[in-house]
């Protein structure tokens, strides 16, 4: 094979690689820390976050219940009413996935078992002894209240939620990141109800 043909192939390969890099970069989610000097318009922020219907959050969750403590890595995807929560790591039961919508929920574990129910709470209590409030989480993880349901809240110096009480849950937020230059989203959340406490650390957002 001639040197000219080899050089042409190399140039073509480099061109393809460059196109892929540019494509991936354009789809990447940008995240910057929210400084104490940044003050957001509360109404604009709320409506922007309310309209945000699709995202992926990755991180670690700590669970404290009945004098027990567990932790796991998670990947949480939301697309409208459809959701998927994958838990894996030191849970002691292998990986599990809970997915569903407003009508039904499926729980699948690493042993190949699949269980269904009308809501995530029922399945998770039966299988894990604790639960994630999926119906509220799709709002609370964005640091906004469920619309048209009674709540009390406090704001921080950035005009973002620092505390929220709703549906029997007490939720506190610390640390925010500005995602895609538009969405101030939390990176640390603590949720408590009765004898259950969830500590959620969000390491990355993708929207």
Swiss-Prot record:
Residues 1-26 form the signal peptide. SUPFAM superfamilies: Prokaryotic lipoproteins and lipoprotein localization factors (SSF89392). It comes from Francisella tularensis subsp. tularensis (strain SCHU S4 / Schu 4). This is Outer-membrane lipoprotein LolB. Pfam families: LolB. It is a lipid-anchor. A lipid is attached at residue 27 (S-diacylglycerol cysteine). CDD domains: LolB. A lipid is attached at residue 27 (N-palmitoyl cysteine). Plays a critical role in the incorporation of lipoproteins in the outer membrane after they are released by the LolA protein. Its main location: membrane. Monomer. GO terms for cellular component: cell outer membrane. One of its GO terms (biological process) is protein transport. Belongs to the LolB family.
